Amino acid sequence: MTITTRHDWTTEEIQTLLELPLMDLLWQAQTVHRDANPGYRVQLASLLSVKTGGCEEDCSYCSQSIHNSSDVSGFEAQMRVEPVLERARAAKEAGADRFCMGWAWREIRDGAQFEAMLEMVRGVRGMGMEACVTAGMLTDDQAGRLAEAGLTAYNHNLDTSPEHYEKIISTRTYEDRLETLQRVRKAGVTLCSGGIIGMGETLRDRASMLQVLASMNPHPESVPVNGLVAVEGTPLEEQQPFEPLELVRMVATARILMPHARVRLSAGREQLSREAQILCLQAGADSIFYGDLLLTTGNPDVEADRRLLADAGVQANWQENASSLAIKAPAST
């Protein structure tokens, strides 16, 4: 099969995909995924909150906003360089080949903290790992300096559709987000950008968000697909949980639209059964966050993920064959 990469998908076409009978949608996604990702390799990415809480933004889903009253909304000091690099080393030893670092900032500001960020990026790259940063908006000069430090990717999620956006965030515009992504790309750093389902959006909103991502040329290097984790103390704390198959549909549709992007199964994975997670891998997810914490919310532990991947018959990027993932079953009696 020859994969045709398109950048002209319409919202209507994407909504039609999302509405397909599940087996038909999975078949289409599988056809693309098997061609684009022979061997079913899955990237293991580890995520660390370097600067937690005290964020000036009012994102309705976020526990780190000063506008919300969660346990982590208050300010915490930025971690120092060496402890961050120690965590990166531990992540690599556990099997991760990408280390993502998060700062709860509205925007990057020049000064000692930015210099420390650059040192962290250089340190992670020096270990032979990919380095990703998420830290809000940035300038052209800052994007250029991050590129010089060796940054692999910059994460800046769209979160939701342009139409639903103002119901979720008021302190930063959708255009601000798109301009940030343009600056990153101009500097030669790849994009990591996706969104969240389960925030009261419609199916049309989900299609619209995917349309924005799929219209980018080239497509983002990584597309995180998140399910809302309703955190106490945030405006969305009483939001009804998303249906697991809705996340499967988002993964499958993202795979069809962006054949060569890494579709990363991200926040909300703890709310999925093992079977639903394996279905997401079948639908086209080829990256997961690895480790028991994602910034401030929970994630399956390392051993559970190793067993999950082994049972699914997929392999991590750094492994030569799927059998090396196997975990011995208890001896029968």
From Swiss-Prot:
GO terms for molecular function: 2 iron, 2 sulfur cluster binding; 4 iron, 4 sulfur cluster binding; biotin synthase activity; iron ion binding. Keywords: 2Fe-2S, 4Fe-4S, Biotin biosynthesis, Iron, Iron-sulfur, Metal-binding, S-adenosyl-L-methionine, Transferase. It catalyses: (4R,5S)-dethiobiotin + (sulfur carrier)-SH + 2 reduced [2Fe-2S]-[ferredoxin] + 2 S-adenosyl-L-methionine = (sulfur carrier)-H + biotin + 2 5'-deoxyadenosine + 2 L-methionine + 2 oxidized [2Fe-2S]-[ferredoxin]. One of its GO terms (biological process) is biotin biosynthetic process. The keyword Lyase does not apply. [4Fe-4S] cluster binds at C55, C59, C62. It is an enzyme of class 2 (transferase). Its cofactor is [4Fe-4S] cluster; [2Fe-2S] cluster. Pfam families: BATS, Radical_SAM. The keyword Metal-binding applies. Residues 40-269 form the Radical SAM core domain. Its EC number is 2.8.1.6. Pathway: Cofactor biosynthesis; biotin biosynthesis; biotin from 7,8-diaminononanoate: step 2/2. Disulfide bonds: none annotated. InterPro entries: Aldolase_TIM (IPR013785), BATS_dom (IPR010722), Biotin_synth/BioAB (IPR002684), Biotin_synthase (IPR024177), Elp3/MiaA/NifB-like_rSAM (IPR006638), rSAM (IPR007197). Gene3D superfamilies: Aldolase class I. It comes from the Bacteria. Belongs to the radical SAM superfamily. Biotin synthase family. NCBIfam families: bioB. Homodimer. This is Biotin synthase. It comes from Synechococcus sp. (strain CC9902).
